């Protein structure tokens, strides 16, 4: 018997690091995108928690009227928020080193930019990490494609909309009531409820919820029983089993008779692709709608579109919505402008037909 001895080539530290980063055997996959995702998301999360608890008031409108958003300044979980950067900063990149002091940076809302930019980098890297892990495991890339919808939505409200409006102060506040305020002001300024892409997004989200509930209830109702009546049907499933866990023929027959035959899928793969596609497509369209309205390509305007034979306006729901929009428009940033643009854009009306006589 002959034994052959070979000198083992040394593996460099960099090669071992690369193997560890890209290994699918780790309990938590890191990946090259993870090298960017973990630090950015940790930074955004840490800054958000600190700012939500203790950040001082921010001069959001740039008119020396600070708005308090943190818990230590009198807010609660519902009313609290990280206030967007000041309108005095606009779209300027505003890291800590650009301010004269940390106090100035906090007063002008610097934490908002720090959180938003790190968050967007983090979620984009998370999306890339999904693709990377799918590639390593030989899977198809649809998980990454589906997650692109919420990434597009977040990018629209946190980055594209401020770019279009010219200031980070128009971005969505990082809080519950701040989100509601953003929605109301968005409706007042852009009539988003009358935008077709927003309508598609509503159909996507609510339709996706409906289809998810329908699919889950159909599957749960047609499970193949593997247990006794005294045991949970969940115990009849073994992880990784090859057999079907529910009777798709029974589910197809039930739903086909409940609605009509062709409303029911007879292909499980096509069904699940549809369940993924519907909400993703809706959220994509909503993000596109926000991005177009960012540059003031607004929703449909049907105001005063119905008149009688005498030319008098017959109000429709469009006019009712417009009246609500005007109310929200004049109420927000009430000290930032003395004459809102929407109210100043009508025809000039004469206040006197003749000039008064002036006696010398």
UniProtKB/Swiss-Prot annotation:
Q: How many cofactors are bound and how?
A: The D1/D2 heterodimer binds P680, chlorophylls that are the primary electron donor of PSII, and subsequent electron acceptors. It shares a non-heme iron and each subunit binds pheophytin, quinone, additional chlorophylls, carotenoids and lipids. D1 provides most of the ligands for the Mn4-Ca-O5 cluster of the oxygen-evolving complex (OEC). There is also a Cl(-1) ion associated with D1 and D2, which is required for oxygen evolution. The PSII complex binds additional chlorophylls, carotenoids and specific lipids.
Keyword Calcium listed: yes
Q: Which residues bind chlorophyll a ChlzD1?
A: 118
Q: Catalyzes what?
A: 2 a plastoquinone + 4 hnu + 2 H2O = 2 a plastoquinol + O2
Q: Which UniProt keywords apply?
A: Calcium, Chlorophyll, Chloroplast, Chromophore, Electron transport, Herbicide resistance, Iron, Magnesium, Manganese, Membrane, Metal-binding, Oxidoreductase, Photosynthesis, Photosystem II, Plastid, Thylakoid, Transmembrane, Transmembrane helix, Transport
Record keywords: Ion transport included?
no
Membrane topology field = Multi-pass membrane protein
Binding residues for chlorophyll a PD1: 198
Q: Which GO terms describe its biological process?
A: photosynthetic electron transport in photosystem II; response to herbicide
User: Where is the site described as Stabilizes free radical intermediate found in this chain?
Assistant: 190
Q: Which residues form the propeptide?
A: 345-360
Gene Ontology terms, cellular component aspect? chloroplast thylakoid membrane; photosystem II
Q: Which family does it belong to?
A: Belongs to the reaction center PufL/M/PsbA/D family.
Name of the molecule in the record: Photosystem II protein D1
- Whose protein is this, by species? Thalassiosira pseudonana (Marine diatom)
């Amino acid at each position: 018997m002959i034994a052959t001895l070979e000198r083992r080539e040394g593996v460099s530290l960099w090669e071992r690091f690369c193997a560890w980063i890209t290994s699918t055997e780790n309990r938590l996959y890191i990946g090259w995108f993870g090298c960017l995702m973990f630090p950015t998301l940790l930074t955004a999360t840490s800054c958000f928690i600190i700012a939500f608890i203790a950040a001082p008031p921010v001069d959001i409108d740039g008119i020396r009227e600070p708005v308090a958003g943190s818990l230590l300044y009198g807010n609660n979980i519902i009313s609290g928020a990280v206030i967007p950067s000041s309108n005095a900063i606009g779209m300027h990149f505003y890291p800590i080193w650009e301010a004269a002091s940390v106090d100035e940076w906090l007063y002008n809302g610097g934490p908002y930019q720090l959180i938003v930019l790190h968050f967007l980098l983090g979620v984009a890297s998370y999306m890339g990490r999904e693709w990377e892990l799918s590639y390593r495991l030989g899977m198809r890339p649809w998980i990454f494609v589906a997650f692109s919808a919420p990434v597009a939505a977040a990018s629209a409200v946190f980055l594209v909309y401020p770019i279009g409006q010219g200031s980070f102060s128009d971005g969505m506040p990082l809080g519950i009531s701040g989100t509601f305020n953003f929605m109301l002001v968005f409706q007042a300024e852009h009539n988003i409820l009358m935008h077709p892409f927003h309508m598609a997004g509503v159909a996507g989200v609510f339709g996706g919820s409906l289809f998810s509930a329908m699919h889950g209830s159909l599957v749960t109702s047609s499970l193949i029983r593997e247990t006794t009546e005294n045991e949970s049907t969940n115990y009849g499933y073994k992880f990784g089993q090859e057999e079907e866990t529910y009777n798709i023929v029974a589910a197809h027959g039930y739903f086909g008779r409940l609605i009509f035959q062709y409303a029911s899928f007879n292909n499980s793969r096509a069904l699940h692709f549809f369940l993924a596609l519907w909400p993703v497509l809706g959220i994509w369209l909503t993000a596109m709608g926000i991005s177009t309205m960012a540059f003031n390509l607004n929703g449909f305007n049907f105001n005063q579109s119905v008149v009688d034979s005498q030319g008098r306006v017959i109000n429709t729901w469009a006019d009712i919505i417009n009246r609500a929009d005007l109310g929200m428009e004049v109420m927000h940033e009430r000290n930032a402008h003395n004459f809102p643009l929407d109210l100043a854009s009508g025809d000039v009306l004469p206040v006197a037909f003749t000039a008064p006589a002036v006696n010398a």
